[in-house]
Amino acid sequence: MIRTNRRKLALTSAVLAVAAMTASSLPAQAASDPGLTTTTIKLGITVPLTGIASPGYNKIPGAMKAYFDYVNANGGVNGRKITLVSKDDQYIPTTAVAKANELILRDKVFALVGTLGTASTKALTASTQLSKRGIPSLFVNTGWSGFADKKAYPTTFSILPSYQMEAKIMAKYVKETYAGKKIAIIYQDDDFGRDALAGFKQAGITFGTYIPYASGSQSLPATGAGWISKLKASGAEVTVLFGVSSASTAALANAYAAQFKTQWVLGSVGGDATTIAATNKAYVPLLFGAKGFSFAPAPTDATDEYIKLFQSIYATAQPTQTFDNNVVAGMSNAFVAVQALQAAGSNLTRAGLIKTIEAKGASFANPFLTPLGYSATAHVGATGYWIGTYDQTGALKADGGKYTVYTTDSGNGPVVESSYKRPAMPAKGLPN
């Protein structure tokens, strides 16, 4: 009996050992994390597809899907095809929470990607307990500096330079270029605008006139007119506008109507010509001469290898749509997401993806003209901007005819001219 039991035990142990060896050689099982099968990865995004903030931003999911489809047609990511589920949050935080819950609980996505807006992203991150549940929130479309704080947001990764970084770079430019001028600022009075104010303060710039506005109020006819009345009364020779594109539209249109001239310096969020054109095409020429900031190559730059690739992919996927900054943003976001998924390997898990971005993200191939700042201690995305001037078509052209990039951090670090050289694009723009 003892010998028989020993033989059975030995046989059982051998079978278990073989089974373990076999299991270790197989791809990740579909049940390891929600949103994964052996052949698919399901991602989700909430974004304003309708509502006041939808013009321009509503193109981001389509741009992301265009790049994902291109990758899928070329073999996918480690044998898996990517699907993207998009939800309309109307730029309303409570709606963003509801839509994020749908993505997580009903659609069972593996990760969120590219959620848009500071207030919406903060709300959905807290309410759905992304951090506690270990759900990655990849490359959020907001520059609020808090999302780069790993301790506060351990599963969230920024992709845009922070608003504090942008404000510090803007401040350096304004102080050096418009010394002695009367300078005013219009800013959105929420975490978006206040993050910028912290950057301006860090850079040591003060404004003669501060004009805050509540998010959404820029669409009211009296709001823009009120801004211009205050600017005229202050004698502002230079006006910084740190708001969304609909705020830029209101400011530029009312300044034109009142025949008020000031040198406009527009933050990156508020300077998209296509978004302004969605309100009224006649407003686009009003951008002429304004200063703008970007960290990606201009969408009109046909000499850039990423722009050429993205234009080709988008023309096939969305032949009736205009290729613009929003498309570049969406496709760039998708590109970096694919790099991260590829680097995480075939045995993909949520925890493994987060660790991969922390360990390797700073070296990911990407379209941006600034370094990425991902590390084991910080979830910082791009780290700088180049400065340009809008022409009569609304295109932002680099000053001096070349991209001169300035980088900084969200603290008290200096603003410096960058010597960063972007790595060559992978073959065919596919993950490597």
Over which residues does each language-model region extend?
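Extracytoplasmic "Venus flytrap"
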Residues: D33-K65, K87-T94, L116-G117, I186-R194, ...
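Extracellular/periplasmic periplasmic-binding protein-like sensory domains
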Residues: A255-M331, P423-L430
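Periplasmic-binding protein-like
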Residues: L103-G117, I135-V140, K182-Y187, G235-S245, ...
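Short, low-complexity disordered leader/linker segments with a strong preference
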Residues: M1-K42, Y420-N432
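Solvent-exposed, acidic/polar segments of extracytosolic/periplasmic ligand-binding ectodomains
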Residues: A362-N432
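Beta-alpha junction/loop-to-helix N-cap segments that form part of ligand/metal-binding clefts
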Residues: A31-S32, P55-G62, N74-K150, I159, ...
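Extracellular/periplasmic ligand-binding modules, especially the Venus flytrap/periplasmic-binding
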Residues: L197-G199, S245-A250, A298-K360
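Extracellular/periplasmic Venus flytrap/periplasmic-binding protein
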Residues: T94-A98, S145-G146, P154-Q259, T300-K308
